[in-house]
């Protein structure tokens, strides 16, 4: 593959836009800035991500995936299971789990700095771009949990860096790197398909459409397809469960649907109001500048696609570092133009202006940091939310909790497992041997499977999402400890039952339901297992 580190234009004189995009050497890379900001990002997450809270519901699910490595899952591409497997290899602790997204976040800061440099940004633009990503609330939240969302912007911005180099140098061979990163991105999260679609449409809407007459972009597409193929084959073999899952979510109205204005409003809030001038100036510059218009159109197409599809607002977040990098270059240029060329001021005065701009961004961004990192215990976080008048937006219709959902979903799991263990271990040994655990949700099943062994609990089974494929249990149980069953289900399927109250103040409201000991199960779990599943 062609080298990504080559700063000079490529000698490929046949490129369709070679002459228009030839440039001189890139600005010097601000290595000290890059190292300092990446270190700050990493240390921030190391010191906050394991304080006061526990495992996130989805993290428990991914740890179960890590014990069942496969080329696909009902609601996830396969790489998330590999990340979790690495965390298990490192001990499976919360710290081992959370160091991976922290590293991804630090890498994203570095990549954003490289994009700003590729766009012609000097030392200040590189610093502002990296700082903006470091302080962006949406990015801080994503990098505080082990989910595919922490890694998604890394793959996308890697692709954008490649596109920017192609636009600057005209070296079409670099599409091979795009294909590699896009293929890995598809194995990380399927929404990379929409990102790739947006890039394709953006190219077709500009004079760069001529790139499709060359072989490199098609070879890149073949590379991406080859990397994505194992997951496609898994989907075919399992009759496309991901499509069924998405259809169920839409049909059941699980997610809050935002109108166009509300969608834009949530973007501004979550990216950070103080960063609006940064990313908006980047978007305007991209759309107005013929050379970088592909980048602006990529964002525009993707944004419209997500709004029309009524996607969750965070689906757009991975593409913003590109705009923050562009905006940083615009601001650097504007300051230099205003203070040096028009006013004839000295370099020292220009530095004062740039430092003032940085200070404004830092101090205006700080109030959001406690809301998206785990630095405050729940009582103080509630008090802080009330003090600043912050009310977290709901992403799901049935979300009921005192705290934002990403935080509430970290509460109550060890306590719930302890309660199940108390029920299980209170049974006589012969009855215990005939008692299984049925969880209604992958979070409960994952918690039992993570914390249960220390209590001697058997593995929990569930028909929720991919857990359905990991069943049925190897034996027919006479009794079940059931979590997230309604009372009617218990009465219909148990000869007798006992209810045990379960309550967690800061957890999700849906978890505050009784745990039941169901004696004399009236069905054969192995026979009914494959009759239905719960995908939503």
Question: Where is each model-derived feature located?
Answer:
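Transmembrane-helix signature of polytopic, membrane-embedded enzymes
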Residues: 3-4, 14-17, 21-23, 27, ...
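Membrane-interface alpha helices of multi-pass inner-membrane proteins
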Residues: 68, 129-130, 162, 174-189, ...
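Specific aromatic-rich, kink-prone transmembrane helix
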Residues: 111, 151-169, 174-182, 326
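Short acidic/glycine- and proline-prone juxtamembrane loop motifs at membrane-interface regions
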Residues: 138-152
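Membrane-interface transmembrane helices that cradle and orient dolichyl/undecaprenyl
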Residues: 16, 20, 117-120, 159-175, ...
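Short helix- or helix-capping micro-motifs
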Residues: 38, 126-134, 182, 186, ...
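Transmembrane-lumen/periplasm boundary regions of multi-pass, lipid-linked membrane glycan transferases
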Residues: 51, 184, 195-292, 306, ...
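Transmembrane-helix motifs of polytopic, lipid-linked glycan transferases
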Residues: 35, 95, 99-120, 158, ...
